[in-house]
Amino acid sequence: MTLLHVTEYGPRDGAPLLAVHGITSSSRAWAALARHLPDMRIIAPDLRGRGRSRALPPSTGMRHHAADLAELLEELGTGAVPVVGHSMGGFVAVALAAARPDLVSALLLVDGGYPLARPAGVADADLADAVLGPVAQRLSQEYPTVEAYRDFWRRHPAFAGAWNADLEAYADYDLVGEPPHLRPASTVEAIAEDSLDLYGSDWHLAALAGLGIPAPLLRAPRGLLDEPGGLYPDLPARPPLAPTMTVTDVPDVNHYTILLTDPGAGIVADAIRVIR
């Protein structure tokens, strides 16, 4: 029996879709997408070390997460399903497709799943902070009230002018503990371990090269702090690593709003309809 906490959106008899969230995210990241795909059964687990799965031991990388998801799909008896992964979830989705091709019919990678450019001169122990910066620092902070944590996100550069009810619910779900010692659910240990798999590990490069199913990638042109360039500023110029991968830029979004707002989620939904 799977140990992961799982949220499902949509009808139980809908066409199944496995949705894999990012490195400090949770199953609540898919609320906007679910509205755009009302006929689909969106299966959205909290990965170990995040959300309501935070008490599980941290993963040992993307392939560990993939094994968790394979166990979940086997338990649900879904057969092969399309898988959408956002940010780190894209890496997990690639690992799942490589390990269990019988469970994955197609991939959609949302600003993730392609190796990140390794910062020059950065040691393995510092990789998480080099990529996530203030995001990683957020995990060690405490918040006196739920409203204080909402205010953190309201002021975040990524959400300027984009705050909505989904984001409020997303922020609320992310908190654990009791006031005045509320903290984000994602554990620092989980982030540190998983960050090592984001820079072109041998297994990841082999998994991409071996993909035989559709694997489009949607790129956000702006990053975690709404800065130009995003996580993949030079992606169009980088060599293709997967024979079935196409790259499409999604206009006017950043790494968060490509999924967590209605305009971005609508484009993600359109891409899912193509591969389902």
Residue ranges and their predicted role:
Residues T7-A55:
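Conserved HGGG/HGGXW glycine-rich cap/lid loop of the alpha/beta-hydrolase fold
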Residues I43-V84:
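Active-site loop/oxyanion-hole signature of alpha/beta-hydrolase fold enzymes
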Residues D46-R50, G113, V253-N254:
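Short beta-to-alpha linker loops that shape the active-site pocket of alpha/beta-hydrolase fold enzymes
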Residues G79-A123:
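Conserved hydrolase catalytic core segment
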Residues V110-P144:
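A catalytic-pocket lid/entrance helix-loop region that shapes and gates access to the active site
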Residues S140-D194:
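Conserved alpha/beta-hydrolase catalytic His-Asp/Glu region
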Residues A165, L175-L241, D249, I258:
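Conserved serine/cysteine hydrolase catalytic core
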Residues I258-R273:
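Post-His helix in hydrolase/transferase enzymes
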